[in-house]
Amino acid sequence: MATLDDLKKRIASVKSTQKITKAMKMVAAAKLRRAQENAEKGRPYSEKMNNIILNLSSGISDKENAPKLLSGTGEDKVHLCIVLTSDRGLCGGFNTNIIKKAKTYFQKISDEGKTLKIITVGSKGYDQLKRVYKDAIVERISFKDSKTINYLDAEKVGKMIIENFEKEEFDVCTIFYNKFKNVITQIPQEQQIIPLKTSEAEENSSEDNYEFEPDEDEILSNLLPKNISTQIFKAMLENSASEQGSRMSAMDNATRNAGEMVDKLTIEYNRSRQAAITKELIEIISGAESL
């Protein structure tokens, strides 16, 4: 049985932890407001650009001179997967959920006899995936030192991917990230960004009608690389908001659990103290009676 001193130390320790988790919850809440606002602002732009690309591509995706970013390499042998996770922990199941979805895709690729290549964005993703897929990881990226998510970071990733694609180092590129819904819910997403899915283009072809100048081919050649960077940027914004929402929820649960533990330990401390006092009184009374 724990002594009174041990219980006092445990209560003090849990209270100290509770203060930390409460502070982290407040910091995450402040960051969440900004991250959520950025993610919501970025959605209309990325969706509209993607729709324009899909509309343009519906008419030329079968042409021999169609951009490779649209038509692909003609092969489906090497798959490049970009997995977005966090650089910091204490965010609940945020990283675990997206890693789980990515691993399901990895297994499917392996079962089909295709080659897998992985780029991890965020140190937590690398730490988890290196145990099984170390040989498949071709690049690890971290924005730990960046205070905010910015388009230039996404553009750097986009340019690197396009350069590798032009060197025919992969045939298909898919990005994995968490889409922010609310503080409690973040939905793991899987989005193919190279080549553009022709099925999506066909579905979207009748939604909007545009007149293009000079022509679709030239506009597509300029817009496709920008669209890839835009879709990566959107994924990064969604992931950032999801991370802060998950961390806020996790720290809120930790703070409540710490409070409950303090209550239980306090009750145990009071009972132990009462038992010690009762024991001392009995010993005093017994000693007095013996005299």
Swiss-Prot record:
Gene Ontology MF terms: ATP binding; proton-transporting ATP synthase activity, rotational mechanism
Pfam family, one: ATP-synt
Gene3D superfamilies in alphabetical order: 3.40.1380.10, ATP synthase, gamma subunit, helix hairpin domain
Protein keywords: ATP synthesis, Cell inner membrane, Cell membrane, CF(1), Hydrogen ion transport, Ion transport, Membrane, Transport
GO biological process terms on file: proton motive force-driven plasma membrane ATP synthesis
UniProt topology in membrane: Peripheral membrane protein
Top-level taxon of the source organism: Bacteria
Family: Belongs to the ATPase gamma chain family.
Physiological role: Produces ATP from ADP in the presence of a proton gradient across the membrane. The gamma chain is believed to be important in regulating ATPase activity and the flow of protons through the CF(0) complex.
Name the UniProt record assigns to this protein: ATP synthase gamma chain
Organism encoding this protein: Pelagibacter ubique (strain HTCC1062)
